[in-house]
Amino acid sequence: MDRVSNLPDGVRGHILSFLPAKHIALTSVLSKSWLNLWKLIPILDIDDSEFLHPEEGKAERLEIRQSFVDFVDRVLALQDDSPIDRFSLKCITGIHPDHVNRWICNVLQRGVSDLDLFIDFSYEDTQEDEDMLPQEMFVSKTLVKLKIRNDRCVDWWCGKGGTSLPMLKSLYIDSDLILWGKMKRFLSSFPVLEELRMASMEWKESHETVSSASLRKLSILGTGCEDYVNPKSISFDTPSLLYLNYSDLVAEDYPLVNMGKLLEARINLIVKDDQIKRVREPNNDLLQDDAGNVVLQFGNVVKLMNGIQNIQILYLTADTLEVLSLCCESMPVFNNLKTLGIKSEEGRGWQAVPALLRNCPHLEYLIIEGLLHNVTDKCGDACDCISREDKGRSLASCPVKKVEIQGFRGTMREINMIGHFLRSFKCLKEMGIFPEEEGPTNFENPGAFEYVEKILKLYNEISNCDVYFLVWGYMRRKWTTQ
């Protein structure tokens, strides 16, 4: 410790900034020089879980809460008005909102640029359903990065003049409900915003527009409108966007999709089981235009795909594949796409996979998470689930060079599909197979690994492809072309 004590104050303050506030406090007993370092620490990380124990009785909880409040007050008092760069506060065990908001205002007044809040105002003496954060936070001139996590409802203060965070570049919100009004007006409060992540999000209106000229990275993990209802329309006017992670109930329309610079997209268009059933009904294109006609409602998803057709990397979930089955004939051509990832589920079909593969003329890398999927009469020629004359035609025309199969369970159906891929992908040079690590597999049976290895070795002899089989991070076997 003597060597550390002899370091310059600035160096010691920098070292302490990597520790939680409670651990920093322990150093203050070493000497007066360590006590004075509080003012030099530009980063504070405060976590009430290090103080509070929910299993204690009510009286004990109240006493410990007060000691936590006293500790935070003391820490902020020691720092006085010294500048602070980052303030992280995890406070989820019922601290009164007056205390929390006072701490937030303290660091705002000192010019904090990075604010990370994980809070819950479920105080025993408070009956409010909404968590009211201090108004000063919504008009800060110094905030560059803001992260809010909350299990309840957060009321986003707009005020008479509206929210104004002119320096904010990164915003992350994870809450069951955020009261903010129209999305377009909400985003106009952040003129230089570059990164936005919204989790557990519910749209306030049935017609919404995500509009930002500066946004480069966008993640929306939504739950549709109130009561889990599909939005009527969602528009994206984000001309500078490079990355999109969009997970939400599929909207009935996508009138505007302005994403000309987009490079990577992860799309999860969530559909309910009853909607899937109606999508698969025979002659569904003859159905009348009514509220229950999901074919007409979701057919406009092709507008979303048209808007992202310049991307280089695309990941699609099993639900998304089902929705895309409605627009196979109008699927855009993805001329720049190099990497395609698809996720399969046994209750969802592959009807859209052949159209996707045909419309990716420069595809190099295909990732398939799970081979097992729902077999239908529209399953297409990408798999060998149904005997057909044109089986494998979409694969033969696909230029993919590398295929990665994740979540392999060792079933005969999967083994047959792997053989189908090796025979049909004419340009394939490499295939990696990764077993399922969480769910049940056939590998629990004696001799299963050896049997799979034997079959894969036979497949390898009929292909011009290197095949490797990895088990829990270790190379189980690799066969190379001769």
Curated annotation (Swiss-Prot):
Q: Which residues form the F-box domain?
A: 1-47
LRR repeat boundaries? 122-150, 175-200, 222-248, 313-344, 345-370
Q: Which CDD domains match?
A: F-box_AtFBL13-like
Q: Which UniProt keywords apply?
A: Leucine-rich repeat, Repeat
Task: State the Pfam families in the record.
Answer: F-box, FBD, LRR_At5g56370
Protein name, please? F-box/LRR-repeat protein At3g58930
Task: Supply the source organism for this entry.
Answer: Arabidopsis thaliana (Mouse-ear cress)
